[in-house]
Amino acid sequence: MSHKAGFVNIIGNPNVGKSTLMNAMVGEKLSIITSKAQTTRHRIFGIVNDEDYQIVFSDTPGIIKPAYDLQTSMMDFVKSAFSDADILIYMVEIGEKELKDEEFFNKIIHAKIPVLLLLNKIDKSNQEMLEEQVQTWQAKVPNAEIFPISALENFNVKEALNRIVELLPVSPPYYPKDALTDKPERFFVNETIREKILLNYDKEIPYAVEVETEEFIEEEKIIKIRSVIMVERDTQKGIIIGHKGAALKKVGMQARADLELFFDKQI
């Protein structure tokens, strides 16, 4: 049997479950997940390896109309996802309308490559609503194969994965067979801390910070990490730190717990 490999790029509106899907497919938490929009700022590769195939999944930022430079940069990541895909996954959720950007929607319906439309969050619907939604989306995106799924509950995800394997082109692997992602360790430290900031702070604070890991030293039983949280204005420092440092301590404890699971070492 010839080896298969290809790039499978996941696109859709914000908060439809793209990151949850990729994490479920890969079996590791690579993309941060919160209820806030635009939590994915970068394009993240997650790699699934088998003896006969390699799937390189790409989680992209949710599609929006850019209002400032960071959002424009985020949409550039989405544009590149159209250009290098072997298979497109268009992720929608029960009850939503088509993409907020008509240009991207037109690219999907005129795509020359296989398109899988994954209708997510079906655990929030009934059979009648589901059948109606499948018919609606089949009319809107006639070139797509539709898979009703629940990424959170891992329902029908395996069936979608099997179909992806069938559609993969014959190719040698693009990455080493033991690779999980194309991102370095520091990237996941930054993203984990940023996820905890998104979960613990309100209003503009989560979107006004950047995280940079300045030190990552891996020893036999422990990883020593030093990260810096950068804010836009001095007045935001006090909010991040909190009363007697309580807010920042909470972020640190939550991030450390997740990172110890991810790296399987003491942090």
Show where each model-derived region lies.
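Active-site glycine-centered loops adjacent to acidic/histidine catalytic or metal-binding residues
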Residues: D59, N120, S150
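P-loop NTP-binding site
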Residues: E185-I267
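Conserved G1/Walker A P-loop phosphate-binding module
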Residues: M1-F82
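Conserved, well-folded catalytic cores of nucleic-acid-processing
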Residues: E28, I47-E51, P66, A81, ...
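Conserved glycine(s) of the Walker
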Residues: G17, N156, A247
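Catalytic P-loop NTPase motifs of RecA-like helicase/translocase cores
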Residues: T40, I63-K65, K97-E98, S125-N126, ...
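Conserved C-terminal guanine-recognition region of P-loop GTPase G domains, centered on the G4
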Residues: D52, D76-A144, I217-E219
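Canonical P-loop GTPase G-domain recognition
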Residues: P114, D123-T181, E185
